[in-house]
């Protein structure tokens, strides 16, 4: 089963308040988007002007206002400030309310969101965070069967736990990966795979996509059944100066992976990001005022095997972006699929 090309909208919870974020997702459906995903942050990456509405409340509100959008997190960490059993219950409920439209995008987590909510001790190294992710996914899937679940893991346990309302179609789990280790796990166990753009094409062609295929092969799975999602960071505007300047709010994306995973305070994150020159900030983004040029840059990811393109626009005028995307980019992109 070959996955079809899908175009999605990234709802920037770090940038917009809850009501505006809901209305933008409703507008995204009207402009033909196939999905809308939202980040799950307790704290934003930017203290001044930042936002952090609760992802699951947003998903439910958007679900009530839309008819066909696939809705999900990109991504949620079901392992520290959350109990994975409760997350399983929440997603099961949404799956019953909006059948076939809900997905859970899951990752290993960042200190920014977990330390503030009570995690004590030294922030865990990758090995523990990865182990927690795998264990939480297994527990949630056990609970989604609707059967009584006695689970005894290294980090989580349940005794006689049942989720009484589970959707017949299940809840697909998308695994977010920035390197081959977790990408292999996505291939073994994920219904979908999530990565982000702007890190050099070699990462996708030589590491991530081969790792997904390797994991699927070892698990005797058909890799074409896995929805391969990428958040494409794109600043498209017919005004080239606006296209460049719009990236500034998202300067934290240009910090190193180590900085993003270890910084605990949005004020500290903002200070580190604002010290970066605009040229460095813009490197993470496709910055373009020409639709053919923008599509040519996006096409690299399609050619690498990614089929679900979720577009993250950095500017504050998201309505303008959605209008321009619908007019200039979507027809060209769908012609590629």
From Swiss-Prot:
GO terms for molecular function: coenzyme F420 binding; glucose-6-phosphate dehydrogenase (coenzyme F420) activity; oxidoreductase activity, acting on paired donors, with incorporation or reduction of molecular oxygen. Its EC number is 1.1.98.2. It is an enzyme of class 1 (oxidoreductase). InterPro entries: F420-dep_G6P_DH, F420-G6PD/mer, F420_G6P_DH-rel, Luciferase-like_dom, Luciferase-like_sf. Substrate binds at residues 196, 199, 260, 284. Keywords: Carbohydrate metabolism, Oxidoreductase, Plasmid. The active site is at 41 (proton donor), 110 (proton acceptor). Coenzyme F420-(gamma-Glu)n binds at residues 40, 77, 108-109, 113, 178-179, 181-182. It catalyses: oxidized coenzyme F420-(gamma-L-Glu)(n) + D-glucose 6-phosphate + H(+) = 6-phospho-D-glucono-1,5-lactone + reduced coenzyme F420-(gamma-L-Glu)(n). It holds the Pfam family Bac_luciferase. GO terms for biological process: carbohydrate metabolic process. It comes from the Bacteria. PANTHER family: 5,10-METHYLENETETRAHYDROMETHANOPTERIN REDUCTASE, PTHR43244. Catalyzes the coenzyme F420-dependent oxidation of glucose 6-phosphate (G6P) to 6-phosphogluconolactone. Homodimer. Belongs to the F420-dependent glucose-6-phosphate dehydrogenase family. This is F420-dependent glucose-6-phosphate dehydrogenase 2. The lineage of its organism: Bacteria, Bacillati, Actinomycetota, Actinomycetes, Mycobacteriales. The gene is fgd2.
């Amino acid at each position: 089963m070959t996955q079809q090309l899908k175009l999605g909208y990234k709802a920037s919870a770090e940038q917009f308040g809850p009501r505006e974020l809901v209305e933008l997702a409703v507008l995204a459906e009207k402009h033909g988007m196939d999905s809308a995903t939202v980040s799950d942050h307790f704290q934003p990456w930017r203290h001044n002007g930042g936002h952090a509405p609760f992802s699951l409340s947003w998903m439910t509100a958007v679900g009530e206002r839309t008819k066909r959008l696939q809705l999900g997190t990109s991504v949620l960490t079901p392992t520290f400030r959350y109990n994975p059993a409760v997350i399983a219950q929440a997603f099961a409920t949404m799956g019953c309310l909006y059948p076939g439209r809900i997905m859970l995008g899951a990752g290993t987590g960042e200190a920014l969101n977990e330390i503030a909510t009570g995690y004590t001790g030294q922030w865990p190294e990758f090995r523990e965070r990865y182990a927690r992710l795998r264990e939480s996914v297994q527990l949630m899937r056990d609970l989604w069967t609707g059967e009584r679940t006695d689970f005894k893991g290294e980090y989580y346990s349940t005794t006689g736990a049942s989720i009484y309302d589970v959707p017949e179609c299940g809840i697909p789990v998308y695994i977010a990966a920035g390197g081959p280790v977790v990408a292999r796990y996505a291939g073994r166990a994920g219904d979908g795979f999530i990565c982000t753009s702007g890190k050099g094409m070699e990462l996708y062609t030589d590491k991530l996509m081969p790792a997904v295929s390797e994991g699927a092969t070892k698990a005797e799975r058909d890799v074409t059944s896995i929805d391969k999602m990428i958040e494409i960071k794109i600043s498209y505007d017919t005004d080239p100066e606006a296209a460049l300047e719009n990236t500034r709010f998202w300067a934290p994306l240009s910090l190193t992976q180590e900085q993003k995973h270890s910084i605990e305070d949005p004020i500290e994150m903002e200070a580190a990001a604002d010290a970066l020159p605009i040229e460095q900030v813009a490197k993470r983004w496709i910055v373009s005022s020409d639709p053919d040029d923008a599509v040519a840059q996006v096409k690299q990811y399609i050619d690498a095997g990614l089929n679900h393109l979720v577009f993250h626009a950095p500017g504050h005028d998201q309505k303008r972006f959605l209008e321009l995307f619908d007019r200039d980019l979507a027809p060209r992109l769908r012609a590629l699929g």
